[in-house]
Curated annotation (Swiss-Prot):
It comes from Shewanella halifaxensis (strain HAW-EB4). The active site is at residues 103, 175. CDD domains: TIM (cd00311). Transmembrane segments: none annotated. SUPFAM superfamilies: Triosephosphate isomerase (TIM). It is an enzyme of class 5 (isomerase). This is Triosephosphate isomerase. GO terms for cellular component: cytosol. Belongs to the triosephosphate isomerase family. Its EC number is 5.3.1.1. The keyword Cytoplasm applies. It holds the Pfam family TIM. Pathway: Carbohydrate biosynthesis; gluconeogenesis; Carbohydrate degradation; glycolysis; D-glyceraldehyde 3-phosphate from glycerone phosphate: step 1/1.
Length: 260
């Protein structure tokens, strides 16, 4: 059985400030216990430099704990007349190691198709970033028992563009759309069922990838439900939204992941 290091990735979305970043670090930087879990902070792009500086300033306090920086999005293009966009190389230069790809809010609000998501996945890896690929079904799709079909389609487009071995350097985040930002989480059993499906599907093409890829759960994760979610055999941590803005609660999630 593969030893997959748990991950807790905090997606600030369009929230936060440089001051908030400082307050978060003051509260949790010295309290992280060890390197048994990886913590990723994904602030708005304008604050990447602030977070990078805080990581450098708190390196001694972090004492070897694995705290990385990630971005919330990137362009599928390397450069050009794409006003407001940020390329993979720019994110790499900013100190990012990870980037969220295909978040449900990007797909829904900005019309990002699975083809665009696959292109962004490729752009991330081209520039040495590890994509955190988000997949998930809507409420109506779940009610129609199409969860596996929807997720398979989203995975297959990325595989067709990039190949299965591209997932050797990737993270998958299952985020049921009906649970994102709603306060309604999937049950541990529901999450495990979908995570197991994702792992099995990748294993059919590459047993190594299937066994070793980390699959996060994203959808109203809180300190009260995290232990049961993270205890599932195919759940390797969480992609956290609003709770990542609360230092006390985010630290609690990190601590739970470290003991999972």
């Amino acid at each position: 059985m593969a030893l997959r290091r748990p991950m807790v990735a905090g997606n600030w979305k369009m929230n936060g400030s440089a001051q908030l970043a400082q307050e978060l670090f003051k509260k949790f930087a010295t309290k992280l216990q060890d390197d048994s879990a990886e913590v990723v902070l994904c602030p708005p792009s304008i604050y990447l430099e602030s977070v990078r500086q805080l990581l450098d300033e708190n390196k001694e306090a972090l004492n070897g704990c694995l705290v990385r920086m990630g971005a919330q999005n990137l362009s599928q293009h390397d450069f050009g007349a794409y006003t407001g966009e940020i390329s993979g190389q720019m994110l790499k230069d900013s100190g990012c190691r990870y980037v969220i790809i295909g978040h449900s809010e990007r797909r829904r609000m900005y019309g990002e198709t699975s083809v665009i998501v696959a292109e962004k996945f490729a752009a991330a890896q081209k520039h040495g970033l590890t994509p955190i690929l988000c997949v998930g079904e809507s409420g109506p799709a779940r009610e129609a028992r199409r969860t596996f079909e929807v997720i398979a389609e989203e995975l297959d487009v990325v595989i067709e563009k990039n190949g299965t071995m591209a997932f050797d350097n990737a993270i998958i985040a299952y985020e049921p759309l009906w649970a994102v930002g709603t306060g309604k989480s999937a049950t541990p059993e529901q999450a495990q069922e979908v995570h197991a499906f994702i792992r099995k599907r990748l294993s059919e093409v590459s047993p190594f990838i299937g066994e070793n890829i980390r699959i996060l759960y994203g959808g109203s994760v809180t300190p009260s439900n995290a232990a049961d979610l993270f205890a599932q055999p195919d759940v390797d941590g969480g992609l956290i939204g609003g709770v990542s803005l609360n230092a006390t609660e985010f630290l609690s999630l990190c601590t739970i992941a470290m003991s999972a």
